[in-house]
Amino acid sequence: AEAARNRKRCPATAALLGSMPAASDMAERGVGECTFSALHGGAHLLPHCGSTNARLTAHLPLIVPDGCEIRVGDEVRQYREGELLIFDDSYEHEVWNRHPTDVRVVLLIRFWHPDIAPAKYAATKRAMRRAVVRHRRNTCLPPLDVSLTPPS
């Protein structure tokens, strides 16, 4: 229901996503998304990694004040309105909006890696869900204090 409401709110974006089977399929399977990503002035998304290399991520910059950039691996790129960036988010990446006040907005689209055949999407989805659980367990749970572990 929410997806249908969002398609009505953003018909041009919905049409764009509909024209990209590798993106719409991933979103419909619940392992990808198409969303507007806003980053407030002065914000920094700390270094992080996605959970899988079975997908790629596209950023289409829509509103870009001065001082907005992304680092993927060792490469830093400036955001420029209308200039598409595609990257594998399983590599460490971080984002800055160094403008003191203005918001940066990108259309973020995740889509199947082109090396994965459509016939493999269902099996890959299952593997991705398992990888996400492991990734969250490894990155979101605090490490166990050694003093709390039972003696062996």
Model-assigned labels for residue ranges:
Residues 62-81:
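A short beta-strand-loop-beta hairpin characteristic of the jelly-roll/cupin
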Residues 1-55, 65-68, 103-105, 116-152:
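Fe(II)/2-oxoglutarate oxygenase catalytic core
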